[in-house]
Design a protein with these regions (language model features):
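The feature captures the beta-strand-to-loop junction immediately N-terminal to the Walker
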Residues: 33-35
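Conserved ABC ATPase "signature" region
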Residues: 103-120
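Helix-to-loop junction immediately C-terminal to a conserved catalytic motif
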Residues: 48
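H-loop/switch region of ABC-family ATPase nucleotide-binding domains
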Residues: 184-185
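Catalytic Walker B motif of ABC-type/P-loop ATPase nucleotide-binding domains
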Residues: 149-152
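Conserved beta-strand-loop-alpha-helix hinge in the C-terminal portion
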Residues: 204-223
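Conserved ABC ATPase signature
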Residues: 124-128
Length: 223
């Protein structure tokens, strides 16, 4: 269980997040939606430890997660994927910063196969399509054994086929017990992928509902 309790963040005098609380269970895919500049991406960066909160607590499995420990539990996939990809090949990307062992190499190969990237293992990440880069970023998160994955606009710039491919892979990960949090403005992707929505508005958690009403979700994304 991931739990967020009364999270606060300010930049100078501007309070970006105010008293945000929610929890997520293994297997959930949750959309984080709301207007631009509402605090959604800030929330993602706080969860993953890229930013430090000014108040509140983030817990996983009932234990508080200090900022320094979050990267091993919560993996944040940015909207600008090119800024996260440094390897000379897909395999190299997965193994960057790690001591390569036969077991680790086998796991990397298994993940590339799982995410339909095995045929591109020796290619440079820059040559991949947007959808393929998203799947590579997911593979990196899984190799680091992150039980929680936060994606910031994962379908931005993707065509319908690649969007559906990413959605399918997220469902596969959720079935394996991962918690998926997806910051998105993409109504079609949220409806196809997520079962629940958290609505961030003016830095607060304005709503939290199961996605069984497309009109309610549409209204939340437009306000």
């Amino acid at each position: 269980l991931l739990s967020v309790e009364r999270l606060h963040k300010r930049f100078g005098l501007h309070e970006v997040l105010k008293d945000v609380s929610f929890s997520c269970s293994p297997g959930e895919i949750v959309a984080i939606v709301g207007p631009n500049a509402a605090g959604k991406s800030t929330l993602g960066k706080l969860l993953s430890g890229l930013l430090k909160e000014d108040g509140g607590t983030i817990r996983f499995a009932e234990k508080p997660l200090k900022k320094s420990r979050r990267r091993g539990v919560i993996w944040y996939i940015m909207q600008d994927l090119d800024s996260q990809l440094f390897g000379e090949s897909l395999t190299d990307e997965l193994l960057t910063g790690k001591k390569e062992t036969p077991t680790l190499k086998l796991r990397a190969d298994e993940l590339l196969t799982l995410l339909n990237l095995a045929e591109f293992a020796d290619r440079h990440p820059a040559t991949l399509s947007g959808g393929q880069k998203q799947r590579l970023a997911l593979a990196v998160a899984l190799l680091n054994e992150a039980p929680v994955i936060v994606l910031d606009e994962p379908t931005s710039g993707l065509d319908g086929r690649n969007m559906r491919s990413v959605s399918k892979q997220l469902h596969t990960l959720a079935q394996k017990g991962h918690i998926i949090l997806m910051i998105t403005h993409d109504l079609e992707c949220a409806l196809a992928t997520c079962s629940r929505a958290l609505v961030i508005r003016d830095g607060t958690l304005a709503d939290d509902f199961q996605i069984d009403d497309a009109w309610r979700l549409m209204a939340a994304m437009r306000e």
